[in-house]
Amino acid sequence: MKKVLFETHHLYYWPNFLPVVEELLKRENYVINVSMPKRSSSFQENILNNVCSVTGILFITANTEEERINKIIKEDYDIIIVGNVGQLNQIASSDALVVMVYHGIGLKQSYYNDIDERVDIRSVESVARFNELKDYGHGNLALTGFTKLDRLVTLANESINETRTKLQIDPSKKTVLYAPSFYPTSIDRVCPFLPELGQDHNVIIKLHGFSWEQKKYHYQNILCSELSKENENIHLLANEDFDIIPYYLVADILISDISSTIFEFLPRDKPIIQAQCYNLKLKHRIFKRRFWGKMDLERQDSVDFTYQISEPEDLLGMVYYAIDNMDEMSSNRIEASEFYLYETDGKASTRLVDAIENH
């Protein structure tokens, strides 16, 4: 039996890992452990620990980060799977096979920068990105597709119905999923228009984990919590509800900004509105080049499958238009899904585990 550690740097990495965990468990010759770096707040850790308890997976923790790292080193794992570089070089032995399933596929340059020579296999979500990384000199690539999206195919209809029931979604209304990034974000400028949107639609708000967990973005969950309390058709998903996949499956339309969600929603072949109305930090308003240097502008310029708005006042009209013309951009979305996501057949995790076993 090979020992596998999923080093889950943040809670929102777990949906990327879950299909890989399920595939490893099916093959029956792996012992799986999960861990998360120690932080001042144990909230994320407690949520993930509970998730692991339900599935019978051992969660590795300790009183301090140093103790946790020492525990991991003593376990001497055969395989370590990460979502970013993080503590990789401290926890991986020289004999361990290190696999990266990167946590996001959005519009930030970190996709190309957050890498380390210690990674033996990097799961890549598309042919285009595979060739791009290869041109940069990376030779540790496995073309798999995006593992997170496997459950768009494998999640049972029963689970989808449970999601609708849990939120008490009005079946007579279309459902809008609003899934903004934490920064830069459209939240400040879009939220004032959500109550009016909620008059004729179910509105589900799925915030980024940092909107709950980092103090400087905490105002975002406060703002959205107030909206949810005051409007019966606006449903804010709690921090514990960190898995967005079930909500992709009940949504008729997605609103986002620079989040990976604009790519993740493509297999649903439903309208996507990209709200390009951000409130930038003062330093980025003054030194704009510093901000745009963190963005993948070439990737943004290639996006031709979303309805794009630069002013929040245009949101309501665009939602109504998109819902009345659901198929208008269908061919763009289908082509984009093939370009940005390789195969969306529910087997990305199978291809990754095959690559691990063949390494």
Positions of the model-derived regions?
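Catalytic binding pocket for nucleotide-activated donors in carbohydrate/polymer assembly enzymes
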Residues: 119, 260-340
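Short hydrophobic signal-anchor/transmembrane segments that target glycosyltransferases
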Residues: 20-23, 189-205
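A nucleotide-sugar donor-handling region in carbohydrate enzymes
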Residues: 118-188, 212-213, 331-335
